[in-house]
């Protein structure tokens, strides 16, 4: 089977991770201690993508939980699904990274990283045919951002040919957690551009908007936000966990979604949106799902795809859905919104189907888009970065941990390059002279 090893780092990563495991345990009929009491063989058929079977009919997640302070992990352990995880897979330090990327990447995190890699190696050895890794973390803090990116590059060294997917919570314009978020995020993006295969960008502000606008929650908690993220994560991994007519795995997804190696930052959406307690009572149809799925209000990253163009996108439908209906709807969307799709990648929408819907829904769809408008998000962080870096504000926290200012400059220019690459492909059209187009292409090849 094609197993995936899951890592969660830092406070944000661990909380999203915990919500994810709660969601998929429910879908596979597992209770809080990993005992199977489901009703359908389909739940068991590909259980071992994410779970190891232990003795006594118990299933244990292939998850490694990492943090530089014990607090969040104690909370996970005390939560409803805390008994699910393998106790040796909790790896934590005592000092904390204090929202300092350098602490997570170079000092505190670097001391702990070998211990984590050992646990990851042990999990990987328990797999028949490891497909890849997924990591949940935020980019604004110290541990998830600094140590998370360190882990990614370490795992890359050890398993160069496996897929690396990240679910990264990017800092949002209005909801700021710390002052140094732009620094941490820029340094992290600098790493992700080089080492990740696919990055699903999630943005707290967009999640807040969805909770307030669509779900009508007056004051959403982080629990509500994490519930949304876990719905998307469960959707993205559906094809791996359940049999379906059109399956896709992390590698197929990347092949279909990433036209140029550096441009692997995706926007995600989910439909129908429901709040934690309520399940949707009205019947949804494929046209409604497609409509809602392509609605900018449904995107979980605060950038509006109408300001850019889709290079590629992928839709994953779950439930009793007719293949033909889906194809028709997707074609319909594409022909109505031609301006939002680049014309030099024909058939750039990929569809996957899975016959098992999420709990409490008849059907659902998950959307993954590679849109050039994601540059807004990097631009915004970059502007905040530049504003502080020009005055060298807060730099001493980083240089004190042994970082060099050069690294900041490099990260800044790498992120600016990323933005202009997105812009270049947004403006590109078929009609441009072939020759000049090829010349533009070349430098990208040799960047490694």
Swiss-Prot record:
InterPro entries: Beta-tubulin_BS, Beta_tubulin, Tub_FtsZ_C, Tubulin, Tubulin/FtsZ-like_C, Tubulin/FtsZ_2-layer-sand-dom, Tubulin/FtsZ_GTPase_sf, Tubulin_C. Belongs to the tubulin family. Tubulin is the major constituent of microtubules, a cylinder consisting of laterally associated linear protofilaments composed of alpha- and beta-tubulin heterodimers. Microtubules grow by the addition of GTP-tubulin dimers to the microtubule end, where a stabilizing cap forms. Below the cap, tubulin dimers are in GDP-bound state, owing to GTPase activity of alpha-tubulin. Dimer of alpha and beta chains. A typical microtubule is a hollow water-filled tube with an outer diameter of 25 nm and an inner diameter of 15 nM. Alpha-beta heterodimers associate head-to-tail to form protofilaments running lengthwise along the microtubule wall with the beta-tubulin subunit facing the microtubule plus end conferring a structural polarity. Microtubules usually have 13 protofilaments but different protofilament numbers can be found in some organisms and specialized cells. Keywords: Cytoplasm, Cytoskeleton, GTP-binding, Magnesium, Metal-binding, Microtubule, Nucleotide-binding. This is Tubulin beta chain. Pfam families: Tubulin (PF00091), Tubulin_C (PF03953). The keyword GTP-binding applies. One of its GO terms (biological process) is microtubule-based process. It comes from Aspergillus flavus. Residues 432-448 have a biased composition (Acidic residues). Signal peptide: none annotated. It is found in: Cytoplasm, Cytoskeleton. Its cofactor is Mg(2+). GTP binds at residues 11, 69, 138, 142-144, 204, 226. PANTHER family: TUBULIN. Residues 425-448 are annotated as: Disordered. One of its GO terms (cellular component) is cytoplasm. It comes from the Eukaryota.
